[in-house]
């Protein structure tokens, strides 16, 4: 059987093929590896690469182009890079580092690339944010005016923190810096605040401890944990705080309040120093590169209180910095102190003396001040800092004076009881009304009759008594936010009744 060839059919097929032909040329910017090691690769031939652009190696390892030089490009690797060889190919991606963001991140543990590391499967996300995005401008902000309660009496009364503030937590190792931060997370329960805890270069066991504590106290429901432990590449330790901030910004621009904790920025600076020295950038003071101030300022400036047009969302930042032997004048501590709106100084001497949280009230300051306090707290805690400072001065004087007059002895005794009333066990944050009751009791001399060892027990019982027998007191403070005459009368009555009960208990 003869096959009849129809020329018109063939020509129509050819015409169709020509129409569908796509003659686009895909240009991929390629380079070759000159040298690789210590988490750094030098690449030749990567022309037109952007600063901070992601580049991809043959083995799918991703890196960031940080040093753009005339002959080559210095790339920091976001992985171990063990299979990258000299001469292997590298291509540009045309992307700047970005991460997926969504509400589904709440309750999850992720790494610096926002990939889940808690074994609970992928996190759905439809949106992306740049890891390094610009901070809100002056016009986009408003001044800090709402308190962010930490639940710690010493902080909320004397070093108040407001929503949108940056407050540094600084102190030697093992002085309870992380405890102050985690207690603040616990106190945000029911306050509609999203918390982000960024652990940089910490031991995996310490991070696991924090996560378990947050889980036990049902705080993981509103918390995201970003972890890059001590064995992570320096690049990822350097990126982790920016990743945490990008996640917090997602919620801030959705009109929510967020709290972010960087634990700690000393480790991030060390990771950045390591990267910079390996990239052969000139070292400066303490061998840190010249732009280490910019490293932290561009991070912390992203914490803000947005204006009403943008929805009044906020990011409150609590960066942690570790000092060596209490030296606040080292490079990183002075840098971060000058960037933040105040600092909480934790002293190892106070910690060892059993004063916990070990806050040195004399050296700690909040530059937002009473703008971040409710009126009731201002009314009660106004003289507290002054009284404690006078007590410290008197104690120094009393070491040299043999006999003190009655007035001085009374003032010393009251100061010691006040200091005792500020002690608080870890993971037991107090509500504002409980704090107000505690401070009022101390500053008005109601604790003077008790032995120092009885103060804690009495205050615990008083707070319980107020909750059960005088719930109106807490109601007044919560609704009016003012320490009214009625609230004062209720509190004085409760103190009187509880004192009588306590005295009877002690006798029995």
Curated annotation (Swiss-Prot):
Membrane topology: Peripheral membrane protein
Residues annotated to bind ATP: 171-178
Site positions (Required for activity): 364
Family named by the database record: Belongs to the ATPase alpha/beta chains family.
UniProt name for this protein: ATP synthase subunit alpha, chloroplastic
Principal subcellular localisation of the protein: plastid
Single Gene Ontology MF annotation: ATP binding
PANTHER family found in the cross-reference section: ATP SYNTHASE SUBUNIT ALPHA, MITOCHONDRIAL
Statement: the UniProt record of this protein carries the keyword Thylakoid: yes
Top-rank taxon, per record: Eukaryota
Location in or out of the cell: Plastid, Chloroplast thylakoid membrane
GO CC aspect terms: chloroplast thylakoid membrane; proton-transporting ATP synthase complex
Subunit relationships: F-type ATPases have 2 components, CF(1) - the catalytic core - and CF(0) - the membrane proton channel. CF(1) has five subunits: alpha(3), beta(3), gamma(1), delta(1), epsilon(1). CF(0) has four main subunits: a, b, b' and c.
Function, as annotated: Produces ATP from ADP in the presence of a proton gradient across the membrane. The alpha chain is a regulatory subunit.
Catalytic reactions on record: ATP + H2O + 4 H(+)(in) = ADP + phosphate + 5 H(+)(out)
EC number per UniProt: 7.1.2.2
Organism: Gnetum parvifolium
Keyword ATP-binding on entry: yes
Record's keyword terms, sorted: ATP synthesis, ATP-binding, CF(1), Chloroplast, Hydrogen ion transport, Ion transport, Membrane, Nucleotide-binding, Plastid, Thylakoid, Translocase, Transport
């Amino acid at each position: 059987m003869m096959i009849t060839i129809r020329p018109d059919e063939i020509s129509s097929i050819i015409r169709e093929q020509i129409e569908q032909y796509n003659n686009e040329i895909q240009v991929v910017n390629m380079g070759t590896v000159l040298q690789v090691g210590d988490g750094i690769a030098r690449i030749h031939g990567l022309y037109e690469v952007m600063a901070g652009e992601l580049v991809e190696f043959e083995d799918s390892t991703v890196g960031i182009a940080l040093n753009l030089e005339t002959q080559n490009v210095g790339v920091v690797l976001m992985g171990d890079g063990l299979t990258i060889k000299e001469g292997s190919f590298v291509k540009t991606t045309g992307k700047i580092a970005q991460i997926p963001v969504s509400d589904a991140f709440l309750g999850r543990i992720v790494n610096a690339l926002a990939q889940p590391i808690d074994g609970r499967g992928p996190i759905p996300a439809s949106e992306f944010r740049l890891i390094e995005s610009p901070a809100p401008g002056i016009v986009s902000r408003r001044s800090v005016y709402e308190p962010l309660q930490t639940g710690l009496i010493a902080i909320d009364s004397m070093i108040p923190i407001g929503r949108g503030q940056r407050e540094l937590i600084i102190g030697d190792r093992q002085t309870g810096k992380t405890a102050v931060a985690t207690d603040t997370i616990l106190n945000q329960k029911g306050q509609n605040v999203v918390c982000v805890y960024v652990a940089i270069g910490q031991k995996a066991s310490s991070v696991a401890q924090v996560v378990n504590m947050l889980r036990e106290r049902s705080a993981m429901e509103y918390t995201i944990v970003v972890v890059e432990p001590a064995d992570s590449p320096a690049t990822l330790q350097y990126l982790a705080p920016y990743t945490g901030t990008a996640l917090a910004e997602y919620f801030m621009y959705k009109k929510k309040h967020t709290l972010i904790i960087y634990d700690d920025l000393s480790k991030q600076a060390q990771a950045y120093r390591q990267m910079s020295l390996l990239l052969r950038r000139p070292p400066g003071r303490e061998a840190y590169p010249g732009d280490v101030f910019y490293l932290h300022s561009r991070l912390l400036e992203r914490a803000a209180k947005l204006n009403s047009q943008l929805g009044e969302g906020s990011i409150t930042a609590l960066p942690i910095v570790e000092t060596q032997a209490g030296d606040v004048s080292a490079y990183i501590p002075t840098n971060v102190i000058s960037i933040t709106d105040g600092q909480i100084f934790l002293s190892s001497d106070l910690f060892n003396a059993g004063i916990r949280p070990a806050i040195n009230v004399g050296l700690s300051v909040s530059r937002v001040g009473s703008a971040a306090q409710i009126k009731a707290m201002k009314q009660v805690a106004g003289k507290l800092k002054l009284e404690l400072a006078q007590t410290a001065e008197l104690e120094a004087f009393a070491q040299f004076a043999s006999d003190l007059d009655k007035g001085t002895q009374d003032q010393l005794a009251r100061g010691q009881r006040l200091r005792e009333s500020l002690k608080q066990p870890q993971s037991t944050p107090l509500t504002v009304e409980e704090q107000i009751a505690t401070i009022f009791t101390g500053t008005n001399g109601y604790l003077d009759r008790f032995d120092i060892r009885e103060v804690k027990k009495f205050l615990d019982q008083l707070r319980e008594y107020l909750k059960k027998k005088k719930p109106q007191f807490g109601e007044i403070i919560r609704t009016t936010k003012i320490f009214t005459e009625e609230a004062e009368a209720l509190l004085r009555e409760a103190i009187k009744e509880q004192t009588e009960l306590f005295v009877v208990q002690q006798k029995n």
